[in-house]
UniProtKB/Swiss-Prot annotation:
The gene is asqD. Belongs to the class I-like SAM-binding methyltransferase superfamily. Cation-independent O-methyltransferase family. Keywords: Methyltransferase, S-adenosyl-L-methionine, Transferase. This is O-methyltransferase asqD. It comes from the Eukaryota.
């Protein structure tokens, strides 16, 4: 039975937590909870949520989740000795966090891990919290002043949005991230966290019929170009399933690349700025953009799409946009919050089908089909071709 003021509308109980993988927890707690704690303060009972998110950030900075996992059970006194923080402060922070199952108080001042504790102890989750607190939270906090100053209109300039208003910079969010090595490291860890428990697009998109069949057998011709693909997670997953399919090209800014390890021989890295440069790889069978366009206002998206279109072969090349497809009515909470978060971060947007159609038309591309993920609220594939 939920206890009053324990936020049963938002916080899953232990039975639900136990039935989910840790990667699902990462989605629930890193995306849904911290963003909702800032965006969805609607009722007096929601007041503690920002305090909970702040307490989680302090616990991450002190390494409390890691110590609880590694040395359980552990007392506040022992945590104070390890971290150098005041014992009373640690107790007060963990006392609040335990009400939301971030840790379990087994006896007075003694703490043991829960499934959430173990998830929060992961470095990629800690990186995500730091990133959100550094950029997303200040941007959302600045929203009232920003919109008042800009006539209550959505941002259309990636150099003059909520992040810029909050952090007093004229850099795009990505330029700002690139300028700070610590923030860049956190961002890359966070973005490299994968799909969680959601199915990969390779599970439900018809790869064989739509990409492999009819592909040019010339080994110099690219099969897939992953535009802005970061660490190459999509291409690595593709290669594991289709090891002899063809040439795979990973494109991004040099700072975003990582060592591909054993896959460096099968995935070709090409430095590319999709906002400033024409697409260098011509005539690929498929150009993949995974969570790229939702980060940018329409005018930037058109520039990105036009750059890709210039390299596409009509009647052969496909454009695959792996993005959220927001319903016109009845949007789920995760998609709605993601829409506000992307707007805050870089003037981006989660788009409806009609908005995707319009965007493709503006770039001179033809919509072929929407492919829906089987996951509720999951991303889809917007498939397009060059007219």
């Amino acid at each position: 039975m939920p206890v009053e003021n324990e936020f049963p509308r938002e916080l899953p109980n232990h039975s639900l937590i136990s039935s989910k993988s840790q990667m699902t927890l990462q989605s629930i707690w890193l995306f849904r909870y911290p963003v909702s704690s800032i965006v969805c303060v609607q009722f007096p009972t929601d007041f503690p949520k920002p305090v909970l998110a702040l307490s989680a950030r302090i616990a991450i900075d002190l390494g409390l989740f890691t110590h609880i996992v590694q040395k359980c059970p552990i007392t506040s006194r022992s945590l104070a000795a390890i971290t150098g923080a005041e014992e009373l402060l640690i107790t007060r922070i963990l006392r609040l966090l335990s009400t939301a199952h971030f840790a379990e108080e087994t006896s007075t001042g003694t703490w043991a891990p829960t499934p959430i504790t173990k998830t929060m102890a992961k470095e990629e989750i800690a990186a995500g919290y730091r990133f959100i607190c550094h950029m997303v939270v200040p941007a959302l906090q600045s929203a009232p002043g920003y919109f008042q100053h800009h006539g209550y209109s959505c941002p259309t300039d990636a150099k003059d949005g909520l992040v810029q208003h909050a952090l007093q910079t004229k850099k795009t969010s990505f330029e700002y991230i690139m300028s700070d090595p610590h923030l860049l490291k956190d961002f890359n860890l966070f973005m490299g966290n994968g799909m969680g428990a959601r199915k990969s697009w390779l599970d439900w998109y018809p790869v064989q019929s739509n990409i492999l069949d009819g592909a040019d057998a010339d080994p110099d011709k690219a099969l897939i170009v992953d535009v802005g693909g970061g660490k190459g997670h999509d291409l690595i997953a593709f290669h594991k399933r289709y090891p002899n399919a063809g040439r795979l090209v990973l494109e991004d800014l040099p700072a975003a690349f990582d060592d591909l390890g054993q896959y460096s021989m099968v995935i070709e890295k090409v430095p590319h700025d999709f906002l400033a440069e024409a697409q260098p790889v011509k005539g690929a069978k498929a150009y993949l953009c995974h969570h790229i366009l939702h980060d940018w206002p329409d005018n930037y998206c058109v520039r990105i799409l036009e750059g890709i279109s210039s390299a596409m072969t009509p009647g052969y090349s496909k454009l695959l946009l792996h993005e959220g497809i927001v319903p016109e009515k009845g949007v789920c909470q995760f998609q709605a919050m993601s829409d506000i978060a992307t707007m805050a971060c870089n003037g981006g947007m989660e788009r409806t089908r009609e908005q995707w159609r319009t965007l493709l038309h503006m770039a001179g591309l033809q919509l072929i089909r929407f492919w829906n993920s089987p996951d509720e609220g999951g991303d889809g594939i917007i498939e397009a071709a060059k007219v």
